[in-house]
Amino acid sequence: MEAWLYNLLQWLALPEHGLSTVFVIAFISATLLPMGSEPAVFGLVKLNPELFWPAILVATAGNTLGGMVSWWMGWGTHHAVNKWRDSSTHIRALAWLEKLGPKACLLSWLPGVGDPLCAVAGWLKLPFWPCTLYMAIGKFGRYLVMTASLLWIFPGQI
């Protein structure tokens, strides 16, 4: 599996793949695989400044679709995690998520907790489309702020 993923990433690193690479990397990084898509977005925009908005939108779409997959995975595992049901941490986290509802998916942009949050939202069977909307808003904001900040910190052409 590791060799396959490495070969895929090497192929996607080819410059002629541009926006499709950003989409695939953003999609994969929204699952529970440890991967960041921000460097791919920044690299593409740094090399092609005219692709700023297309890259942000494509990354948002890929990352949101990946979050939707995580939601469905969480929904499908609803019956598989009964053994953690009684822990106090689990009960507090579930109460917090149920209180916030789909709006909790605004936090899907957070590193480390955002992707599992999408899965837990599915596990809780929070409404799919509102969760998707809030995921998209959070992820769009992350890509916009992160890419604009990096371009501001590292100005000029390569």
PLM region descriptions:
Residues M1-F23, L47-I158:
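Membrane-interfacial helix-loop-helix
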Residues F27, T31, P39-N48, W123-K125:
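Structural signal for alpha-helical transmembrane segments and their flanking helix-loop junctions
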Residues I28-E38, L107-G114:
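Short helix-coil transition sites and intra-membrane helix breaks within transmembrane domains
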